[in-house]
């Protein structure tokens, strides 16, 4: 085997080149590491040995014929042959002739806000990581020592930045690269800022709704970005003290794809239009969703039995996109248990929403005061008078259900087991009713009577007996409750523009006399004791009604202590013309 020989002149040349490269690798600062470029074409080649502090470009540029911006970038590399290294917090003083071209190269080891200041007006263009995508940084307000055209990047990611400068006039130029935002000394930046983040889990659909309060500082110019981080045993939580760290962690998860569009990774995050829902990539642990001025976001494709940490950042549009951390929260994305209902308590529950079905649970007490077979009584009052159905479940098996009802209704559940837990599922009777079926009032009791609620009759209809020009007589079935009881008749005036009783029926309002008078469109009210009649029929005449008007009438049963319960609402339509006082209509 022959050993290859090398000429002495070639060995000296290689030794000189290696010593120059080694000297270039050593010369760097902690905040910004620079590599001396011997030739402009070296920018387009990947180095053989990567610098651990500065990541190389992760995107392979597209061919020049397919990407005009890359073609222009390569042309600028040839035209701007005068190269100068730029370091963070180290000013550069140079003298430039008119129309002289200068190229600055800045390498960042860490993501940070970046401000580049010029002492004189110059033309400038900035590129990130040799991708050929020109950045569009915001301008810095001119001031002492800061000329018009200075640049600010709210978040400069790790990597190489090429800054091409064209002098407009002859003279001295000072260039400063500062690792801070020009608004970093804003007095409110470190002020106490308490904002609540609320979440709603939909584990079956792998969805989560995130809502938050608006910013207390300059809310009219504040935009929001939500950072979602999935936590696991393999990937512990990363603490983001600023928005740049979150963007850096997000971009490190995936290589940048070649693109001819202007702007860097941060502009791609901010530039995405706000959407009502956003699908998360389950292969990534960090996600960033910017919502603009919207203060809620629907997230999809979450992983069950996982924990998520939410960081909310504000983007101040009036201060050059200054970012500040507003709030944080941690959520366990597990199946939530149904809300447990309490006995002898009238509770208002939500039954609407995108699901259309809501489930609540209740437990039969271990010991009951009943002598015979144990049972449970349910009082159900649809708030808006919409038709709903109820199903009773035990261990996922249906043990009872009701027909559609729209007024106060009692259900007697027999054959219950003491100590067992049951589920109560509400759902609208049809798709049309789903628009109005939003809330329902529920009361449970294992006794024959509700302690603080009056008993309503089986038929809760209120009848319109007779209507005259300015009066109406109504009747209803008396309560079977033997306790001391009274009735209140409450009249609301329906507005002329909309006389639909559907829009104004509300069985869940506070019918306490002192409070019901505060409601809108309240017209008249009277309360009296029950009447003694053989058929247990109660009647009342309502006076001073206006011809041509429409009224919504409620009758409530009231105990001396406790909450009143309403009968079914009645609508009165008064005739618009009345020839004499004897004119009347019967129903």
UniProtKB/Swiss-Prot annotation:
Pfam families: NDNF (PF10179), NDNF_C (PF19433). It comes from the Eukaryota. It is found in: Secreted; Secreted, Extracellular space, Extracellular matrix. Keywords: Extracellular matrix, Glycoprotein, Repeat, Secreted, Signal. One of its GO terms (cellular component) is extracellular matrix. The keyword Isomerase does not apply. InterPro entries: FN3_sf (IPR036116), NDNF (IPR019326), NDNF_C (IPR045805), NDNF_Fn(III)_1 (IPR055271). The keyword Nucleus does not apply. Its main location: secreted. Residues 1-24 form the signal peptide. One of its GO terms (molecular function) is carbohydrate derivative binding. Glycans are attached at residues 109, 129, 190, 321, 334, 459, 498, 558. GO terms for biological process: cell proliferation involved in imaginal disc-derived wing morphogenesis; extracellular matrix organization; extracellular regulation of signal transduction; imaginal disc-derived wing vein morphogenesis; negative regulation of BMP signaling pathway; negative regulation of canonical Wnt signaling pathway; positive regulation of BMP signaling pathway. Secretory protein that acts as a feedback regulator of dpp/BMP, wg and hh signaling pathways. In the developing wing, is a dosage-dependent modulator of dpp/BMP signaling involved in wing growth and crossvein patterning; low levels promote and high levels inhibit dpp/BMP signaling. In the early pupal wing, inhibits dpp/BMP signaling activity to prevent the formation of ectopic crossveins in the posterior compartment. Binds to dpp and gbb to modulate their release and activity decreasing dpp/BMP signaling in the responding cells. Binds heparin. Interacts with dally; the interaction promotes dally degradation. Interacts with dpp and gbb. PANTHER family: NEURON-DERIVED NEUROTROPHIC FACTOR, PROTEIN NDNF. This is Protein NDNF. It comes from Drosophila melanogaster. The lineage of its organism: Eukaryota, Metazoa, Ecdysozoa, Arthropoda, Hexapoda.
């Amino acid at each position: 085997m022959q050993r290859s020989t090398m000429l002495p002149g070639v060995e000296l040349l290689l030794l000189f080149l290696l010593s120059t490269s080694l000297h270039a690798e050593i010369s760097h600062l902690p905040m910004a590491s620079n590599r001396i470029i011997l030739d402009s074409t070296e920018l387009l080649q990947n180095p053989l040995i990567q610098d651990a502090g500065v990541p190389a470009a992760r995107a392979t540029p597209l061919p020049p014929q397919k990407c005009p911006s890359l073609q222009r970038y390569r042309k600028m590399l040839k035209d701007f042959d005068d190269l100068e290294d730029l370091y963070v917090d180290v000013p550069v003083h140079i003298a430039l002739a008119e129309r002289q071209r200068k190229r600055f190269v800045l390498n960042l080891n860490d993501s940070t806000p970046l401000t580049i200041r010029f002492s004189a007006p110059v033309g400038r263009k900035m590129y990130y990581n040799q991708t050929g995508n020109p950045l569009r940084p915001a301008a810095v307000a001119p001031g002492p020592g800061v000329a018009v055209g200075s640049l600010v990047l709210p978040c400069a990611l790790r990597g190489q930045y090429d800054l091409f400068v064209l002098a407009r006039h002859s003279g001295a130029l000072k260039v400063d690269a500062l690792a801070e935002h020009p608004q970093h000394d804003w007095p409110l930046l470190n002020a106490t800022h308490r904002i609540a983040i609320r979440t709603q889990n939909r584990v079956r659909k792998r969805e989560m709704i995130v809502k938050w309060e608006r910013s207390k500082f300059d809310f009219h110019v504040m935009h929001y970005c939500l950072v979602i981080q999935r936590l696991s045993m393999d990937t512990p939580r990363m603490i983001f003290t600023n928005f740049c760290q979150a963007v850096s962690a997000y971009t490190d998860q995936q290589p940048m794809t070649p693109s001819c569009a202007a702007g860097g990774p941060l502009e791609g995050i901010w530039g995405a239009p706000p959407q009502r829902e956003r699908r998360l990539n389950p292969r990534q642990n960090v996600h960033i969703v910017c919502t603009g001025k919207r203060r809620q976001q629907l997230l999809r494709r979450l992983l069950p039995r996982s924990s998520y940490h939410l960081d909310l950042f504000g983007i101040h549009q009036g201060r050059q996109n200054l970012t500040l951390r507003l709030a944080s929260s941690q959520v366990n994305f597990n199946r939530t248990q149904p809300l447990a209902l309490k006995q002898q308590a009238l509770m208002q529950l939500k039954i609407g929403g995108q699901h259309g079905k809501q489930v609540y649970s209740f437990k039969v007490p271990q010991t009951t005061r009943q002598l015979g077979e144990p049972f449970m009584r349910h009082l159900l009052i649809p708030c808006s008078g919409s038709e709903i159905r109820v199903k009773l479940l035990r261990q996922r098996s249906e043990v009872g259900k009701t027909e559609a009802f729209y007024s106060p209704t009692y259900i007697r559940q027999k054959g219950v087991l003491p100590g067992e837990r049951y589920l109560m599922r509400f759902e609208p009777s049809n798709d049309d009713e789903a628009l109005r079926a939003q809330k329902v009032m529920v009361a449970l009791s294992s006794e024959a009577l509700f302690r603080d609620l009056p008993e309503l009759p089986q038929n809760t209809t209120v009848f319109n007996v007779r209507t005259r020009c300015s009066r109406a007589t109504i009747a209803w079935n008396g309560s079977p409750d033997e306790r001391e009881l009274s009735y209140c008749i409450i009249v609301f005036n329906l507005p002329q523009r909309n006389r639909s009783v559907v829009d104004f029926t509300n069985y869940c309002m506070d019918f306490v006399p002192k409070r019901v008078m505060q409601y809108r469109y309240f017209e008249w009210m009277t309360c009296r004791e029950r009447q003694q009649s053989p058929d247990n029929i109660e009647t009342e005449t309502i006076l001073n009604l206006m011809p041509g008007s429409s009224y919504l009438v409620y009758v409530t049963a009231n105990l001396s202590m406790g909450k009143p319960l309403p009968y079914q609402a009645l609508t009165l339509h008064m005739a618009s013309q009345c020839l004499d006082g004897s004119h009347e209509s019967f129903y």
